């Protein structure tokens, strides 16, 4: 994922920052507690496509 794109993108629900997951397959919104998938290099920024973070992921800094 292009770092410039990551700087521009924000969580569609909270308008807060997103963090690229360690395996580079999701964009994480800690504020919303959601992980948005990245498919074929394209972030899918739809709440209906996001998965909820589990407790450990929410607490992970």
Swiss-Prot record:
Belongs to the UPF0434 family. It comes from Pseudomonas aeruginosa (strain ATCC 15692 / DSM 22644 / CIP 104116 / JCM 14847 / LMG 12228 / 1C / PRS 101 / PAO1). It holds the Pfam family Trm112p. PANTHER family: PROTEIN PREY, MITOCHONDRIAL, ZGC:162634. Gene3D superfamilies: 2.20.25.10. This is UPF0434 protein PA2980. GO terms for cellular component: cytosol.
């Amino acid at each position: 994922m292009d770092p410039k794109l990551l700087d521009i993108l924000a969580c569609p629900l909270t308008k807060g920052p997103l963090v690229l997951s360690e395996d580079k397959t999701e964009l994480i919104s800690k504020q919303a507690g959601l992980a948005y998938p990245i498919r074929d290099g394209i972030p899918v920024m739809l709440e209906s496509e996001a998965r909820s973070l589990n407790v450990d992921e929410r607490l992970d800094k």
